[in-house]
Amino acid sequence: MSSFRKQAALLGLTAAVFAASTAQADEKVTNPDASTTSTPVANQSEKSVAPTGNEKGTASEKTDAPTKQDENATPVTSTNTKPSTETTSSKEGSLADDKALQPTEGQEVDVRILTTTDLHTNLVNYDYYQDKPAENVGLAKTAVLIEEAKKENSNTLLVDNGDTIQGTPLGTYKAIVNPVKEGEQHPMYAALQKLGFEAGTLGNHEFNYGLDYLKRVIDTAGMPIVNANVVDPKTGAYVYDPYKIISKTFVDKNGRKTTVKIGVTGIVPPQILSWDKANLEGKIQVNDSVEAIQKIIPEMRKAGADITLVLSHSGIGDDKYEKGEENEGYQIASLPGVDAVVTGHSHAEFPSGNGT
């Protein structure tokens, strides 16, 4: 494995370690902006393949009953990528500038991935169930940490790992009492967009209010929402964008600008078909997370991704692969071609502080 890939793997691990959630119910998150290219909708193959390879990055574990709060927030670490050189004067104008920003062999860029997960509509630091302020939840508090992290390293990608739109009275109000209308932006995504989130994925609780509601929310999210394991049960076509390639202009260790293309994809636990059976039965199929990522990684590489990032709304799990497991973060991190993984869903910290 190249030095870049190894460091990218560590990046994912650190991202997972620092990713925290603001939650009173259950899982993880997402984000906007940046130039992106979409991927074609394709059929999902059903190969039962156990992952192999060495470990790359992950975070957080799970229990799926609506539980209490969670933390919130996020920085990560550095990685060196195949970057580029600063532009010089040229008769070709912008074309020459574009070429000058392309990565060159041996160029190193420190990149920080910032993540949130399992926000569960906790916009402010207030526990609505106990009707009092709470210091361990709230996107408003996390926003300060995000700004501080960006000041420390401007080469950042800010993403959300799902379980974003459910969990407090705000989530219920915007889904049941005064539902998000066609063309209206959900308050959670309005806040994430304001903070500069660039991509996100779906958690299991995104499906609590049905597919029609979820579509309205995603359509106005203001950022790419990706998922690679939810497909049409008849055609096998992806229901959501399976990935996005996000082009970021970073500055290398020598002060030269370079463009790095980050391929972002995501998964949700297949168990949503049981947890939300009334909303989902016969309408979608949810493929094994490991197989879905195994299939999509080569497509992202072919589309030009320098780095691959998996937003795994899943706990870490273990080193024993069983098809259809709920928590497959470890297995996904072990797949060839996966550079970084963000996990969540379990409302747990990794490392835990007790050696696990």
Question: Model-predicted segments: where are they?
Answer:
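Sec-dependent signal peptide cleavage junction
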Residues: 20-33, 37
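Long, intrinsically disordered, low-complexity tracts enriched in Ser/Thr with interspersed Pro
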Residues: 27, 43-86
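Bacterial Sec-dependent N-terminal signal peptides
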Residues: 1-12, 22, 26
